[in-house]
Amino acid sequence: MFYETLKEICQKKNTTPSAVCLAIGISKSNVTEWKKGRSPKLDTVVSIANHLNVSPARLIPKKEEP
């Protein structure tokens, strides 16, 4: 899930998902939606990745094989 991956990366970078939202200029309410399982738009993923200095692919959870 996107939120879990984001949270893990944020912990390693000593920040929070809410702080990242504020830094890139989007509403903190997005965090609540991500916690519910929604995924952000691609441009948001890219902005978050740039802010955290990670690859956008790192933020996108891999699909589990059946």
Residue ranges and their predicted role:
Residues 19-21, 48:
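Short alpha-helical "recognition helix" segments of helix-turn-helix
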Residues 35, 52, 60-63:
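DNA major-groove recognition helix of helix-turn-helix
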Residues 12, 23, 51:
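Residues within the alpha-helical elements of helix-turn-helix
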Residues 25-39:
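Recognition helix of helix-turn-helix/homeodomain-like DNA-binding domains
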Residues 1-14, 19:
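A short, Lys/Arg-rich alpha-helix, primarily the initiator
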Residues 19, 30, 58:
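Residues in the helix-turn-helix
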Residues 43-58:
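DNA major-groove recognition helix of helix-turn-helix/homeodomain DNA-binding modules
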